[in-house]
Amino acid sequence: MPHEMEENGAEVSDVMSENEDDTETFLKDDEKMTEQSTTDSTTEVKKKYDPKDPLRPRRKKARRACFACQRAHLTCGDERPCQRCIKRGLADACQDGVRKKAKYLHDAPPEALRPVLGPNYNPTPTPSRTNGHRHSSSQSDNLSATGSNFFSQGSTASLPVYSAGAQTPVAIDGLPSFNPQTSPTSFQGPINNAAHTPMNNMMPAGNMDFNALFDPSNPALYNFDLEGLNFGSQYAGWEFGILNKMALGAETPPRENSMSQTPTTEANYAALFGNANNGFDHPMLGADFSGMDQNNQSLYAQGNLQHGLPHAYAIAAGPTSLASPSTDTTASPHSVAGMDGSPNHNFAGIPTVPAATRPRPKHNKAGPKSILGKRQRDSAAIYESVKEPYPYTTGFHNMVAVLRNRLPGNKLLRIAKALGEIRPSFISCTKDLTRQDLVFMEKCFQRTLVEYDDFLQHCCAPTIVCRRSGEVAAVNKEFTALTGWTKDVLLGKEPNLNVNVYSGRSTNGTNTPDHNSQGEMTTPRPQRAMLDLSGGRPQPVFLGELLDDDSVVEFYQDFSQLAFEDSRGKVQRSCRLNKYRAPQDPDQKEPGSQKDAQPGILSSRVTRIDGSHGISRIEKDGKVECTYCWTIKRDVFDIPMMIIINFLPRYLPDQGPQQLAV
């Protein structure tokens, strides 16, 4: 036994134990205990270590010393009763000592400052004793004598309710039953205070004391095991639990009234104890609380201060509402107990202060929207809606038909040569894929497109997302402002009436149109019979229709290099984008003349920028000089899935910054 005390003993948890006199006292006391408890015939000489020797074995620190060891400034252990009290015959009176509170913890209730119960904690209940010489503040011995039912220790001690006067232990024998016909946060208290029925639907099985319900360090409040986390400090475990609760609460899509829909298997303490507007009603308190507030002293009254509710919350003692702490004058309108308009319950004798009423927003029938402004999306809807694979073969045929009707023969031959290099690789990658694989490939594309929609909303550069066949799948507003191509036209939801294209079969070898040929004509579209093969889905605009001739050739030459050879590469080049020009109705007036006729509120410079998106100065011959950078996103089969392209407009070669409107 002495060797176990020397090896497994704990260091003194008080500051006074570091002195040399205390160490000598401990050595003398240890020698006396050794003489009294030694019964073996074989005596071993115990090696004594110099207290000043830095190489002496260090003792293990105790979490908290008992009251007897704390008074004697001796080493104590984590177990209760400790070994020293057992040897001294003080096992029945061994309990945790009371430490002096720090100033910033003066308002914290004692049960919130309870130490974390370690694995060596002995849950044996010991009778609490009263000490007349101890001060009658919130530091009471019987608080830490036994663990509450929340920590599964089996103890049923009645903890006191603290007021400005003496300590008066009050226990709850029963609480009114919960009416399942009403809302989850509404309660009906009995008329007769003497008759009580157990609260089976609200509380878990087992006896429960009053202060334990108010205990903010209770792990059941946030459904995590504080003891099992094995934190050295309760505050670290409490912080970890709150962060864990926040992480588990971040769901997509958000559930409506998720805070008020508490499972019936857990204790709904948040509905029991609300803010200043949602406390107890007097009939609900029962006969045990009838004389508690005779002098208009609230539950948390300290000294001469009278509090309806605490004005601030100390560490590990937070408000019962998950919203910000509320005071008497500013009550939170989002308290958990009052989310669905439940009736207000108040303590007897405590005046209520009306909270600032705010208009409650109307909920959309489509579903609740997130408070943080995130767009609600459901991945399950994407997986259920995609039933057929995407016809990429038809898409490539339509792309070739568009390029064949537009480009001259020499440039079309260069594009065909570039596509011929990657065609065998596409065939070898897709020949072993089944129909289910192709459907899954399309689901991956649609799910990835949802993520890129958020990216497009926050990207300030003009950006488009295309399939590997060149069909536009997503676009942001900046690209529309730069080129004039609207989103509905690019995605095929509206007809493409662009007249800013020309047939290149009889061109003079440059990017300028040959006026001796057909001249301006609408964008050549594939035949209707070919479009019907796609199942009647809208035909988006191809990337080849947005770029000029030379830029299209350069793009597909770069695409042949990045498709399979350089999987992580990117391309940065100069290009020219075709502006969208719809045929104007002769009866329709010029938009500029209408704007000039109206009295403008903005200045002339801002009006010019707003009228032409600030792009008219960098446009030449219906084209916009740009620098673009693009990369390839691959699917789970390592096949090019989508192409993400960013554009930035740039100056013309003979243009200065002063000539720009932006």
Swiss-Prot record:
InterPro entries, per the entry: ERT1_acuK_gluconeogen_tf (IPR050335), PAS_13 (IPR056751), Zn2-C6_fun-type_DNA-bd_sf (IPR036864), Zn2Cys6_DnaBD (IPR001138)
Cross-referenced SUPFAM superfamilies: Zn2/Cys6 DNA-binding domain (SSF57701)
A GO CC term attached to the entry: nucleus
Key words of the record: Activator, DNA-binding, Gluconeogenesis, Metal-binding, Nucleus, Transcription, Transcription regulation, Zinc
Main subcellular localisation: nucleus
Comp. bias intervals (Basic and acidic residues): 25-34, 43-56, 582-593
Record-level Gene Ontology MF annotations: DNA-binding transcription factor activity, RNA polymerase II-specific; RNA polymerase II transcription regulatory region sequence-specific DNA binding; zinc ion binding
BP GO annotations: cellular response to starvation; gluconeogenesis
PROSITE patterns: ZN2_CY6_FUNGAL_2
Residue spans of biased composition, Polar residues class: 121-130, 137-149
Localization annotation: Nucleus
Location of region: Disordered: 1-61, 105-149, 502-524, 580-606
Superkingdom per UniProt: Eukaryota
DNA-binding positions: 66-94
PANTHER family in the record: TRANSCRIPTION ACTIVATOR OF GLUCONEOGENESIS ERT1 (PTHR47659:SF1), ZN(II)2CYS6 TRANSCRIPTION FACTOR (EUROFUNG)-RELATED (PTHR47659)
Chain's role: Transcription factor which regulates nonfermentable carbon utilization. Activator of gluconeogenetic genes.
Family named by the database record: Belongs to the ERT1/acuK family.
This protein's name: Transcription activator of gluconeogenesis NECHADRAFT_59099
Organism: Fusarium vanettenii (strain ATCC MYA-4622 / CBS 123669 / FGSC 9596 / NRRL 45880 / 77-13-4) (Fusarium solani subsp. pisi)
